[in-house]
Curated annotation (Swiss-Prot):
Name listed for the protein in its UniProt record: UPF0502 protein PSPTO_2686
Organism of origin: Pseudomonas syringae pv. tomato (strain ATCC BAA-871 / DC3000)
Positions of transmembrane segments: none
Entries under HAMAP family matching the protein: UPF0502
Pfam families referenced in this protein's UniProt entry, alphabetically: DUF480 (PF04337)
Family of this protein: Belongs to the UPF0502 family.
Domain of life where this protein originates: Bacteria
Family annotation (InterPro entries): DUF480 (IPR007432), WH-like_DNA-bd_sf (IPR036388), WH_DNA-bd_sf (IPR036390)
Species lineage: Bacteria, Pseudomonadati, Pseudomonadota, Gammaproteobacteria, Pseudomonadales
Length: 221
């Protein structure tokens, strides 16, 4: 399937970005940690590397080095998407996606989820965003996704054989990386075909707890 957007070009948009996979992961992590762990945000370089390499709530799982993350942070800073915050003990990094891409908070959260976990259904996005933004229902999620699509920052992926729902994916990455990610997700069985929404939510909550434990353990190593 060819990944295209029917949006009228605006500035800034996905065509002007085409971030690499490391940059995509960094922005997704900064958005996530700002929403879920505000007490430790902005993040130090070490904390950001740990977040990037989490084994849960990430698709794909990555193994980035401090050098790779640091280089990508500087590249993102040059595009106005991250900012270095100087500190007395350690320097920290924050994202500027809201200003850099002119997004409202709900759109920032959805973009972060799409950056971290690839193509997802509306139901998945609604469940996974519950700790980060208060969407009243799936219609609110769809409304914000449609605004991202209109900006050329996301696209609708029609359901494939064996799938019950359409999916949405971001268009901020390199086109070849996006094609590979989409192909992998289309070949994988749909998660939760026989699971209830409550069961899916419990699984996502468990993943969040595991991710928090992984982060604590990594800091002790």
């Amino acid at each position: 399937m060819s990944i295209e957007s029917s949006a009228t070009p605006t500035t800034p948009n996905a065509e002007a970005l085409q971030l690499n996979s490391t940059e995509v992961r960094i922005l997704g992590c900064l958005i996530e940690k700002q929403a879920t762990n505000p007490e430790t945000y902005p993040l130090t370089l070490n904390a950001l590397v740990i977040a990037c390499n989490q084994k849960t709530s990430r698709d794909p799982v990555m193994n980035l080095t401090q050098g790779q993350v640091g280089q990508s942070l500087r590249a993102l800073e040059g595009r106005g998407l991250t900012r270095l915050v100087m500190g007395s003990r350690a320097d920290r990094w924050e994202h500027k996606v809201d200003k850099g891409l002119e997004l409202v908070p709900a759109q920032v959260i959805l973009t972060g989820l799409l950056l971290l976990r690839g193509p997802q259904t509306v139901s998945e996005l609604l469940t996974r965003s519950n700790r980060m933004h208060d969407f009243e229902d799936s219609e609110q999620v769809v409304h914000q996704l449609e605004r991202l699509i209109a900006r050329g920052l996301a696209t609708l992926v029609p359901r494939q054989s064996g799938q019950r729902e359409d999916r949405y994916m971001h268009l901020i990455g390199d086109p070849e990386d996006l094609q590979d990610l989409l192909a992998a997700r289309q070949q994988a069985p749909e998660r939760g075909n026989a699971a209830s929404p409550a069961a899916t939510q419990r699984l996502d909550e468990l993943e969040a707890r595991i991710a928090a434990l992984e982060e604590r353990l990594a800091r002790l190593e």
